[in-house]
């Protein structure tokens, strides 16, 4: 059987650049090399695309705090549409190896917000994960919450700040509506980038300023007292949910360093120590949230489980991490689907959706 060429797109002009490098390394290591050849398409912090050497594409690969994309001499350009050579060398115009399917693992801005997905759609390339609309909606916490709320799903009460209205909403108003503690977040960031826990007016002002450094829109959320539970969802039209896992914190909240740098900042418990009926309840809610937002391929649904066993949806991540400590692959492994088979299934789902899209009529 002829191998498929999988283009792994990673890195990116994003605050989550280093997380993406870690994810890409694990996917490259785990992919079924009897079925797939890998083409590494690295995006540096300036947004320039490169074709990377699979044997030597990372610096400090085993150090999450200092991992970096090794510079490459080959810059990449992409030709939209159905072409034999979709990728060309940007410097000399010569064709580069073709790819059959793209596995995007660019976390954060321009990677999981629909931007990259739109480019791949225009290029007529199959790709792993959700389409443009679902990616954009899940990236924007304000939009996510509105859609989940309209579907009757439980979310934390919140207020949305913009640069236009931020000075018209006082801390007293926010505290009156949401109470304390509060969580202040950039609307369009992941991995807890720019997120602050707030218990005072002074902290609130600092937190809002920080969040606006990363986005034009900021979410202020009521702090929910509860356990942090995560569930992995996989599939297109008939998605399946994994067993649940729990993030047990040793720090104040699940910040960026806790997730990716400080190995002692949190403990990942899979499966979560919850009653079977609660596990099933969360799995059903995760699938409902996934379908409400129109997700495809994969997503991780994060919820809070209150002491009263109320499930409050926190967020939906359409390109979850594949780092050494990432929950998504661990949840499927605990559910009987190993890392290599998970990657294979994600590629299959991408090809299935692309075939279905191409079967749609484009003329009257």
UniProtKB/Swiss-Prot annotation:
UniProt entry tagged with the keyword NAD: no
Cofactor note: Binds 2 magnesium or manganese ions per subunit.
Stored Pfam families: Dala_Dala_lig_C, Dala_Dala_lig_N
Domain of life, source organism: Bacteria
Chain positions recorded as Mg(2+) 2 binding sites: 315, 317
Binding site for ATP: 175-230
Residue span(s) of domain ATP-grasp: 145-348
Uppermost EC category: ligase
Function: Cell wall formation.
Protein name as annotated: D-alanine--D-alanine ligase A
Taxonomic source organism: Escherichia coli (strain K12)
């Amino acid at each position: 059987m002829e191998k498929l060429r999988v283009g792994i797109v990673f890195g990116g002009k994003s605050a989550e650049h280093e997380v993406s490098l870690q994810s890409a390394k694990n996917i490259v290591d785990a992919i079924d090399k009897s079925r797939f050849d890998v083409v590494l398409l690295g995006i540096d912090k300036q947004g320039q695309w490169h074709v990377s050497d699979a044997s030597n594409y990372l610096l400090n690969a085993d150090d999450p705090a200092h991992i970096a994309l090794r510079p490459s001499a080959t810059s990449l350009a992409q030709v939209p549409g159905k072409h034999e050579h979709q990728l060309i060398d940007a410097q000399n115009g010569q064709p580069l190896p073709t790819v059959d399917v793209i596995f995007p693992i660019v976390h954060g801005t321009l990677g999981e917000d629909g931007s990259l997905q739109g480019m791949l759609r225009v290029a007529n390339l199959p790709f792993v994960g959700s389409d443009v609309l679902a990616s954009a909606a899940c990236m924007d916490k304000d939009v996510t919450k509105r859609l989940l709320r309209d579907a009757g799903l439980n979310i934390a009460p919140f207020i949305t700040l913009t640069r236009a209205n931020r000075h018209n909403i006082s801390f007293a108003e926010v505290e009156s509506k949401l109470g304390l503690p509060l969580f202040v977040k950039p609307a369009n960031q992941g991995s807890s980038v720019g997120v602050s826990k707030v218990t005072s007016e002074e902290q609130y002002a600092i937190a809002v300023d920080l969040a606006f450094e990363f986005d034009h829109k900021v979410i202020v959320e009521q702090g929910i007292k509860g356990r942090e539970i995560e569930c992995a969802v996989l599939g297109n039209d008939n998605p399946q949910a994994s067993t649940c896992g729990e993030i047990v914190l040793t720090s104040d909240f699940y910040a960026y360093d806790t997730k990716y740098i400080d190995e002692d900042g949190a403990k990942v418990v899979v499966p979560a120590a919850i009653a079977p009926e609660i596990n099933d309840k969360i799995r059903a809610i995760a699938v409902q949230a996934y379908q409400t937002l129109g997700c495809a391929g994969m997503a991780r649904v994060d919820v809070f489980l209150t002491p009263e066993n109320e499930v409050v949806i926190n967020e939906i991540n359409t390109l979850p991490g594949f780092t050494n400590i990432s929950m998504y692959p661990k949840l499927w492994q605990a559910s009987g689907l190993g890392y290599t088979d998970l990657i294979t299934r994600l590629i299959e789902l991408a090809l299935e959706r692309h075939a279905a899209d191409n079967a749609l009529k484009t003329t009257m």
